[in-house]
Curated annotation (Swiss-Prot):
Documented EC number(s): 2.1.3.2
A GO MF label: amino acid binding
Known role: Catalyzes the condensation of carbamoyl phosphate and aspartate to form carbamoyl aspartate and inorganic phosphate, the committed step in the de novo pyrimidine nucleotide biosynthesis pathway.
Pfam families to which the protein is assigned, alphabetical: OTCace (PF00185), OTCace_N (PF02729)
Reaction it catalyzes: carbamoyl phosphate + L-aspartate = N-carbamoyl-L-aspartate + phosphate + H(+)
Designated name of the protein: Aspartate carbamoyltransferase catalytic subunit
Length: 310
């Protein structure tokens, strides 16, 4: 891989290689008192986040450090960005200072692609950690890793993605990747939260959740992104929860093997009931744990591309 910007252009062989590497890394580190591999020693990884993040930012930082890379965090508010410096100039500065890889989260859709274009001649590689409402490829990869652990191969599996599709970069990335890996995807949301052009995503679209439950292998719940909304997309949080929330009654209607995912942060009591979030059938903590190993695998494929040094 030259960069990781989206899952839309990720072929099955590359995606599977990353997932397999993540599994190998997880097993390699299992039970170790010191979780450290020398694979990326001497490499410099910079995280550049223009939006708030807990899981993704910490996960990338841990991933880089566990691979022995030097990890530098650039905060938009505490850097020259706060003085008005452009994304392009900031990126070129970081590359000139020796960054081998820049991990970027930005509120503008397409920001990671533009960054990769500006840095193409420098050799610095780019990972998209979420760009606006466009994509979040490493989230989709860690979701796929979690599903593979719970369900085995994903070909032929049926996965529902439920909630705020309109504002969700997670939904877009997951649809592309799950379909590439052979899964069937059904999108479930109120009509007001379905984006234009969704018919080109290659997934089924439904507006009612309950009829879908008995035939699902997995349900991925999305947070309602109120911070991106300017208007009434549904009558109330209570009515949304009644129609689309994963409660104990709905959990009981899923097949026994079915797994519940959530990319976080969760709104307990809205899209997911606390009892469901804490149920053994939910793999939410596993997603976070797998996120570290998947991001280690992404950095490995971008920066090393050799046998994993144990």
């Amino acid at each position: 891989m030259r960069h990781l910007l989206s899952t839309e252009g990720l072929d099955a062989a590359t995606a599977t290689a990353v997932l397999d590497t993540a599994g190998t890394l997880k097993q390699t580190l299992l039970g170790r008192e010191v979780r450290k591999l020398p694979t990326l020693r001497g490499r410099t990884v910079v995280t550049m986040f223009y939006e708030n993040s807990t899981r993704t930012r910490v996960s990338f930082e841990v991933a880089g450090k566990w691979m022995s890379a030097d990890v530098i965090n650039v905060s938009a508010g505490a850097s020259s960005v706060g003085k008005g410096e452009s994304l392009r100039d900031t990126a070129l500065t970081l590359s000139a200072a020796g960054a081998d890889c820049v991990i970027v989260r930005h509120p503008a859709s397409g920001a990671a692609h533009r960054l990769a274009g500006w840095l193409e001649a420098t050799g610095t590689q780019v990972v998209n950690a979420g760009d606006g409402m466009h994509e979040h490829p490493t989230q989709a990869l860690l979701d796929a890793a979690t599903l593979r652990e719970r369900l085995g191969e994903l070909a032929g599996r049926r996965v529902a993605i439920v909630g705020d599709l309109l504002h969700s970069r997670v939904a877009r990335s997951n649809v592309h990747l799950l379909r590439t890996l052979g899964a069937q995807v059904v999108l479930v949301a109120p009509p007001t939260l379905v984006p234009a052009g969704v018919e080109h995503w290659g997934a089924e679209v439904r507006h009612e959740l309950d009829p879908e439950l008995p035939g699902l292998d997995a349900v991925m719940l999305l947070r309602v992104q109120a911070e991106r909304m300017h208007g009434g997309f549904f009558p109330s949080a209570r009515e949304y929860s009644i129609a689309y929330g994963m409660n104990e009654a709905r959990l009981a209607r899923l097949p026994e093997h079915a797994v519940v995912l959530h990319p976080g942060p969760m709104l307990r009591g809205m899209e997911i009931a606390p009892a469901v979030a804490d149920s053994p059938r939910a793999a939410i903590t596993e997603q976070v744990r797998n996120g570290v190993h998947v991001r280690m695998a992404v950095l490995y494929h971008l920066l090393a591309g050799e046998e994993i040094a144990a």
